[in-house]
């Protein structure tokens, strides 16, 4: 008779995301994962595979949550400019702990993308998806006369992806809220 799981896989995966986010892939041990996830070694392997497979699942889970948040943000805000403003200024107001963790996907890029083709592919696809979300929002803004049609929506989308990645990297090094707000202000001026 098959044993029932004594843990909730979704909660365990969320715990794994937090461990990898805090420690990075290389500095995360299986013992730490098992403790934080509340799972036994065999249950971890049976449910998620090895450490690398779990890491990939954690990256995808984090990525999917970010994509959903961004889509929801642009669907709920009154204007595209308001959406970008909320995204950038909310990022500048994150706590010191949030800034020190940075972005899990950016950390994965710096830590592993040159050594792991599958992770590099996942990260490139993530960037393209975010650029697509931003470009769609920018095109809506152009269609409604909010943003000049003289600006290339795809180029602006790439600019905002790069701005966010830069803000995440800077915030991790130096929790200077005012500097991050200045960057957000300059970036938003590109929508004028």
Predicted regions: what is each one?
Residues 83, 97-118:
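Amphipathic alpha-helical segments used for helix-helix packing
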Residues 101, 151-170, 183-190:
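Hydrophobic alpha-helical segments that form the core
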Residues 1-7:
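N-terminal intrinsically disordered/low-complexity leader segments
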Residues 11, 15, 19-53, 57:
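Helix-turn-helix
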Residues 86-93, 128-144, 154, 173-192:
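C-terminal peripheral helix-coil segments that are non-catalytic and often amphipathic
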Residues 61, 72, 118-129, 133:
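Short, solvent-exposed amphipathic helices
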Residues 60-66:
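Short, basic, alpha-helical segments at the C-terminal edge of helix-turn-helix-like DNA-binding modules
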Residues 57, 71-101, 153-157:
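Hydrophobic alpha-helical connector segments
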């Amino acid at each position: 008779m098959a044993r029932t799981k004594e843990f909730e896989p979704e909660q365990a995966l969320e715990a794994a995301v937090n461990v990898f986010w805090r420690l990075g892939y290389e500095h995360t041990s299986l013992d730490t994962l098992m403790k934080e996830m509340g799972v036994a070694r065999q249950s971890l392997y049976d449910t998620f595979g090895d450490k690398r497979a779990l890491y990939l699942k954690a990256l995808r889970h984090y990525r999917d949550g970010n994509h959903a948040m961004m889509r929801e943000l642009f669907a709920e805000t009154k204007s595209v400019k308001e959406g970008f403003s909320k995204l950038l200024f909310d990022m500048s107001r994150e706590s010191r702990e949030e800034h020190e963790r940075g972005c899990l996907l950016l950390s994965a890029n710096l830590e592993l993308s040159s050594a792991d083709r599958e992770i590099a592919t996942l990260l490139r696809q993530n960037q393209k998806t975010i650029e697509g979300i931003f470009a769609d929002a920018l095109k809506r803004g152009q269609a409604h006369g909010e943003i000049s049609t003289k600006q290339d929506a795809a180029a602006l989308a790439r600019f905002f992806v790069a701005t966010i990645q830069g803000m995440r990297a800077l915030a991790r090094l130096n929790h200077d809220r005012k500097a991050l707000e200045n960057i957000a202000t300059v970036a938003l001026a590109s929508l004028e």
